[in-house]
């Protein structure tokens, strides 16, 4: 595509990694996903994690009830894996389309992961079942150990956990979520696209770790996996700018109340739903790779999940768009990524 492109029409995207939370927060943030995306993979790490079919059905119903009339989308539910997860429960949930995937959180790796897995060998029967039925395993890929530097956790996870897992279960479909490093890019590209792919967030494409400390600590840029060196950011940008089918859109939009982002133990997570798609467009434009925008946003994900590609389209135009400054949640607020900033692209209907 020409660098002078003023309008882009693509198949309506899906977001393959979304945190909607619950209750008041759910009610206030949900429309921002529905505005831009046709489907969304919903993360299960609520305060009471989604560990069963019944919990998933109930949570999906709450999501549907909260959905904005003008911004509807299809929530794709996931199961939070614990040491108590039953292979039969997973198989039933997957066969009935209650779950589209299961999520592996290493214990203590991020928000509400205290009941996550300490040793992946503890869930071998679950993984055997998932490989057999073709159920994708979604992974937060960080090795959690106080002796491992936080900036090295992702690379260590590949070495210590992911590579042995791939060798033991070569036909297990795996998504390494929100990758942040050159090592992850190289590892993913060297594996079969049918069995290993990765999502990439807009903030890891736009920022490096210096940004988190520019002018003082920036709590709203604190996320997990943490922002990395610029060489890693550039590796991510290069990965998406050549049309590689291994990589697809997963925003990891993660809302937290303002008071919980700025306190003594601030929460990790960036709420980017109001700007995520437009941020991806910005990055692809900067990389002169707009011709690959549709495959990353709208095609690679459904192909990996063996789902139909959407028929609906969305038109993005070269028109300034100011990102909402804050979202009120009762007496609290949520501050989104790029709060109050202006992006050069808008949805045509805006």
Swiss-Prot record:
This is Dihydroorotase. The lineage of its organism: Bacteria, Pseudomonadati, Pseudomonadota, Gammaproteobacteria, Enterobacterales. One of its GO terms (molecular function) is zinc ion binding. It comes from Buchnera aphidicola subsp. Acyrthosiphon pisum (strain APS). Its EC number is 3.5.2.3. The modification N6-carboxylysine is found at residue 103. The active site is at residue 252. Keywords: Hydrolase, Metal-binding, Pyrimidine biosynthesis, Zinc. Pfam families: Amidohydro_1 (PF01979). Zn(2+) 1 binds at residues 17, 19, 103, 252.
């Amino acid at each position: 595509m020409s660098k002078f492109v003023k309008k882009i029409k693509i198949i309506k995207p899906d977001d393959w990694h979304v945190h909607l939370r619950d209750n008041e927060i759910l009610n206030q943030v949900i429309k921002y996903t529905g505005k831009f995306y046709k489907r969304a993979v919903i993360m299960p790490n609520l305060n009471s994690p989604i560990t069963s079919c019944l919990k998933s059905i109930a949570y999906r119903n709450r999501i549907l009830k909260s959905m904005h009339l003008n911004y509807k989308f299809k929530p794709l539910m996931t199961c939070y894996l614990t040491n108590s997860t039953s292979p039969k429960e997973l198989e039933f949930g997957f066969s009935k389309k209650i779950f589209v995937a299961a999520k592996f959180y290493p214990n203590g790796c991020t928000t509400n992961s205290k009941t996550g897995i300490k040793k992946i060998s503890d869930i071998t029967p679950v993984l055997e079942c998932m490989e057999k039925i073709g159920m994708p395993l979604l992974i937060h890929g960080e090795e959690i150990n106080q002796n491992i530097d936080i900036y090295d956790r992702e690379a260590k996870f590949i070495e210590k956990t992911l590579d042995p897992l791939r060798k033991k279960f070569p036909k297990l479909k795996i998504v390494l979520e929100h990758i942040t490093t050159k090592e992850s890019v190289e590892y993913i590209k060297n594996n079969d696209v049918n069995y290993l792919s990765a999502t990439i967030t807009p903030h890891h494409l736009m920022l490096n770790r210096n940004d988190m400390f520019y002018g003082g600590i920036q709590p709203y840029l604190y996320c997990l996996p943490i922002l990395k060196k610029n060489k890693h950011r550039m590796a991510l940008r290069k990965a998406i700018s050549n049309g590689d089918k291994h990589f697809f859109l997963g925003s990891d939009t993660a809302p937290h109340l303002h008071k919980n982002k700025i306190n003594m133990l601030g929460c990790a997570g960036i709420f980017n739903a109001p700007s995520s798609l437009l941020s991806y467009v910005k990055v692809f434009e900067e990389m002169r790779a707009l011709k690959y925008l549709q495959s990353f946003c709208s095609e690679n994900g459904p192909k990996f999940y063996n789902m139909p590609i959407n028929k609906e389209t969305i038109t993005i135009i070269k028109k300034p768009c100011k990102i909402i400054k804050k979202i009120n949640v009762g007496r609290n607020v949520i501050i989104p990524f790029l709060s109050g900033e202006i992006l050069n692209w808008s949805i045509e209907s805006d």
